[in-house]
Amino acid sequence: MAPRGCIVAVFAIFCISRLLCSHGAPVAPMTPYLMLCQPHKRCGDKFYDPLQHCCYDDAVVPLARTQTCGNCTFRVCFEQCCPWTFMVKLINQNCDSARTSDDRLCRSVS
């Protein structure tokens, strides 16, 4: 292939990939298979967009979902409730780990 043909082929591949991966209006897939270039994760048997939802207790929930932990409110997608100490920790921290500046101590509700 001539150098000019290579340039045209590379340009065509670039244009097609940009078209397939463009972030236009969202389109719901007609099949259970994922569309190319869409960031999706799985929660049980359902797929979800991690930019809008998370998987909490085997259910797809919005990122803004909150629950109570004692007298505190925590964001289930980013924090967790340690019920035996009524402490809210970041989701990736172990409830048994030492207290950090990110932790919130909550009182139990009687």
Swiss-Prot record:
The keyword Secreted applies. Detected in ovary and spinal cord. Residues 1-24 form the signal peptide. GO terms for molecular function: signaling receptor binding. The keyword Magnesium does not apply. GO terms for cellular component: extracellular space. Glycans are attached at N71. It is found in: Secreted. Keywords: Disulfide bond, Glycoprotein, Secreted, Signal. Belongs to the IGFL family. PANTHER family: INSULIN GROWTH FACTOR-LIKE FAMILY MEMBER 1, INSULIN GROWTH FACTOR-LIKE FAMILY MEMBER 3-RELATED. Homodimer; disulfide-linked. Probable ligand of the IGFLR1 cell membrane receptor. This is Insulin growth factor-like family member 1. It comes from Homo sapiens.
